[in-house]
Design a protein with these regions (language model features):
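Post-Walker A helix-loop "phosphate-sensing" segment adjacent to the P-loop in P-loop NTPases
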Residues: 67-78, 106-107
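Charged, amphipathic alpha-helical linker segments immediately N-terminal to NTP-binding catalytic cores
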Residues: 1-23
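C-terminal alpha-helical "lid" subdomain
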Residues: 2-7, 55, 203-204, 212, ...
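A short hydrophobic beta-strand->loop->alpha-helix junction that borders the nucleotide-binding pocket
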Residues: 80-91
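Pre-Walker A adenine-sensing motif
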Residues: 29-41
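Walker A/P-loop nucleotide-binding motif
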Residues: 44-63
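Mid-core helix/loop region of P-loop NTP-binding domains shared across ATPases and GTPases
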Residues: 4-10, 29, 92-96, 107-156, ...
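The catalytic "switch" region of P-loop NTPases
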Residues: 142, 153-231
Length: 328
């Protein structure tokens, strides 16, 4: 018999695992595929710069793409078709090279000079049959605020691409573009650029896609009753400024609370409380999830019930849904 804790644990885990693909991500995946396909076939590898503000899904994009191209171990050794790394802090070329070497399972990833690390990296890129490199948080180099660092990074990256012919995707804040400005040859290689923007409300297509995402998340929650997120998409847009990361942060927090209350669906009061607790103070707007919200004030939402009981439903052979009424 499944225990109450197991059922609740599974419900909460599914909330965290929810991911909704959408048109913008699928378009970005195609661009990644095009870069990867250029390896070994095009005269020059096709590289791409992906830019966007925090919360538009840049890092999620990289993680999800990697799920479809996992590393494999064969009789010939480790194969890593897509090599990814997040630029560490402090951002130095040695640290970046070490991070890439570590992903290629180099036991000496942290050792040696930059030249030695770069030589090992070139060798391992070939041995592991790497077809695409994706570097996330590339703006960390810009945050060093040193023209010398930017010039050195741009030269190192340009040479790596030239010597290995492996296409590279750079992901970062718009400030990452400064690396390209510093090097004409590198700027030419990264002439293809993709800007990820928050979902707008004034554009019909963007607004409709935003609603579709909310509806898909609603279905994925598997509550006993639909929460109707798409019906108050305008509230979500005000709360999130069109950033899907903020939307998911609010929905996850609200869904966890609804589960704890044994509520059949996520209600506005759950979202109102999540907004108060999860939105950074400097980003605060009038709480759009309050009843009668007029966009002018923030009012504390109703407190959660003082007494909440959860019990266990006898097994029916059906996988429990989020928010199931669990009784003995």
């Amino acid at each position: 018999m499944t225990s109450r804790d197991d059922i609740l644990s599974g419900a909460h885990a599914r909330i965290e695992e929810i991911f909704v693909d959408h048109k913008r991500f699928r378009a970005a995946y195609r661009r990644f595929d095009e870069c990867r396909a250029s390896f070994g076939h095009a005269a020059e590898p096709e590289c791409l710069l992906v830019m966007g503000s925090s919360g538009v899904g840049k890092s999620t994009l990289m993680r999800r793409y990697l799920l479809n191209t996992p590393m494999q171990r064969t009789d010939e050794g480790l194969q890593v078709p897509v090599l990814t790394a997040t630029i560490p802090v402090p951002a130095t070329m040695k640290n970046m090279a070490a991070s890439l070497l570590d992903r290629l399972e180099d036991p000496l990833a942290d050792r040696g000079t930059l030249l030695q690390k770069t030589r090992r990296l070139r060798r391992l890129l070939k041995e592991c049959q790497v077809e695409l490199i994706i570097l996330d948080e590339f703006q960390h180099f810009i945050e060093r605020d040193s023209d010398r660092v930017i010039l050195d990074v741009s030269d190192w990256l340009k040479n790596l691409i030239s010597e290995t012919a492996v296409p590279v995707v750079l992901i970062g804040l718009p400030s990452a573009k400064r690396v390209l400005v510093a090097n004409e040859q590198l700027r030419r290689r990264f002439s293809a650029q993709l800007h990820l923007e928050p979902f707008g409300w004034g554009d019909d297509a963007s607004r409709d896609e935003f609603r579709r995402i909310l509806n898909a998340v609603d279905l994925a929650l598997q509550m006993r009753q639909p929460s109707g997120f798409a019906d108050f998409a305008d509230r979500f847009h005000v709360a999130s400024r069109g950033l899907i990361a903020t939307v998911m942060k609010l929905i996850r927090a609200a869904a966890h609370r609804a589960i704890r209350e044994n509520a059949p669906r996520v209600e506005l009061r759950h979202l109102a409380r999540a907004f108060d607790e999860r939105v950074f103070p400097e980003d605060r707007r009038p709480n759009p999830f309050l009843d009668g919200w007029d966009g002018s004030v923030i009012t504390t939402p109703d407190p959660e019930p003082a007494n909440t009981s959860v019990s266990i439903r006898k097994s029916t052979g059906r996988k429990p849904r989020l928010g199931d009424n669990l009784h003995a």
